[in-house]
Amino acid sequence: FVPSRGLGDVYKRQVGKSDSQEQLRTALALGADRAILAETDSLLEPLAIAKVLSKVIEEESPKLVILGKQAIDGDNNQTGQMLAAMLNYSQATFASEVIIDEDFASVTREIDGGLQTIKVSLPAIITTDLRLNEPRYASLPNIMKAKKKELDVKPIEEMGVDINNRMELLSVELPASRQEGIKVESVEDLVSKLKEEAKVIS
């Protein structure tokens, strides 16, 4: 989605620490019209992030909100769905293709055994799959322009949003380490180990 295709203004919104400004400037260099940072040093759970985004979105009233399907830290896959419920927006998840047609969006999503295409009314929340789009490279002139553009930074504490976490992290455990592999000298040795040790053949 880029402004040159006549799809309206593109706003980049992010919840995070002050160093998140780097990602916002990258978005500006790639063609976003505005960038908004809801700034906090706290580690927020999906519900809190959805509340913050809801507050920002209510002020802007966009017709389409696009999010990643899940964060790489918690891997929760919850924020988009919670946000759609809070705003009473249509929603579609795991989108690999999105086509906008006036007041509707046609969304193709990968499911077990094939592809599913659904039609949702706008405004809508869509979470994306990696296959939706291949990011473009920003040109050097646009990178330099983005450095001079003003960012809209809003401390979360001033937004009147309850960001208290409702979840308690009890533990994080690494998976069991795999046994180191061995090399065998011959096919006979391999067959013997598969029979006697692995017991996968008889």
At which residue positions do the language-model features occur?
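Single conserved hydrophobic/aromatic residue that forms the stacking wall/gate
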Residues: 1-11
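N-terminal glycine-rich FAD/FM-binding segment characteristic of electron-transfer flavoproteins
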Residues: 9-202
